[in-house]
Design a protein with these regions (language model features):
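Glycine-rich, highly charged phosphate/nucleotide-binding loops
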Residues: 50-61, 78-87
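Phosphate/ribose-recognition catalytic cores of enzymes acting on nucleotide-derived substrates
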Residues: 176-254
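A conserved beta-strand->alpha-helix junction
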Residues: 35-39, 67-78, 132
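Residues at the starts of beta-strands that form the adenosine-phosphate
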Residues: 30-34, 69, 96, 127
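Residue-level signal for inorganic ion chemistry
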Residues: 12, 64, 98, 159, ...
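Classical nucleotidyltransferase
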Residues: 81-186
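N-terminal catalytic cores of NTP/NDP-binding nucleotidyl/phosphoryl-transfer enzymes
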Residues: 1-56
Length: 254
């Protein structure tokens, strides 16, 4: 196998550029491309704080499965391994080459120099290769942190450009206060994943898929203090949808 390692939140264009290199190098070497990722975000394990995420674990795994052979690790189980110990584990699992992202580091010894990883690789029997960064002239600097900043600033267009797809949240439709219906605007409130990052409060133009059809949707993110609901809500008014969608799984896309 030829492998790469990371959390890959959002599976954005920079990640997919890395995976493209992984597949090309694998084809040239006759090796199966493999992606090693973690079940938990490292900050959740190391700092006890779960950061807002661009993709839930299931969303992330689903996106990664199409990019290479997927291996999901528990970060809590490997957090104390040094880079050498971790590479020994990879070698035992059949990894012959390791492609490292241009800004990626791993191991409890917190090595920062690529030459150290290359040296350990030689000692372990793994060829360590540096990946190229996605050229900035294509879409500018791309990172999960930059996408989070764009979303938090309400710049969904920039976030989508860096992601390479439209940002979305999904969840089951739950009973709201039905106030929208009383003023002629029936809405669907979804019970979205708590770890999912939302843009700032406001009304956004988007789309929603219902029963194999896409509908233009006004998505309202915010609180509803007029009815005593202080939690953040995700509520969509789907233009042209008739009937009750309560209990259905919906996906709001921006």
């Amino acid at each position: 196998m030829i492998a790469t390692i990371g959390y890959f939140d959002g599976v954005h264009r920079g990640h997919r550029y890395l995976f493209e290199q992984l597949r090309q190098l694998g084809a040239a070497r006759g090796l199966v491309p493999a992606i090693y990722t973690f079940r938990e975000h490292p900050k959740e394990v190391l700092c006890g704080v779960r950061p807002p995420l661009l993709t839930t674990p299931n969303e992330r795994f689903r996106l990664l499965e199409g990019e290479g052979e997927l291996h999901v690790l528990s970060f809590a189980e490997i957090r104390r391994l040094t880079a050498a110990e971790f590479m020994q584990r990879l070698h035992a699992e059949g990894v012959q080459s390791l492609l490292m992202g241009y800004d990626h580091h791993f191991g409890a010894d917190q090595l920062t120099d690529f030459r150290d990883y290359a040296r350990i690789g030689r000692e372990t029997g793994i060829e360590v290769l540096p990946a190229n960064e996605l050229p900035e002239e294509i879409v500018g600097h791309v990172s999960s942190s930059a996408i989070r900043r764009a979303l938090l600033a309400g710049d969904v267009e920039s976030a989508n450009r860096m992601l390479g797809y439209t940002y979305s949240i999904r969840g089951r439709v739950v009973r709201g206060n039905a106030i929208g219906r009383t003023i002629g605007f029936p809405t669907a409130n979804i019970d979205y994943a708590a770890e999912k990052l939302l843009p700032p409060a406001g009304v956004y133009a988007g789309r929603c898929r219902v029963a194999e059809h896409d509908y233009p949707t006004l998505v309202n993110i915010g609180t509803n203090p007029t009815v005593g609901n202080r939690s953040t809500t995700a509520e969509g008014y789907m233009l042209g949808v008739a009937g009750d969608v309560y209990g259905q799984q919906l996906c709001f896309r921006w």
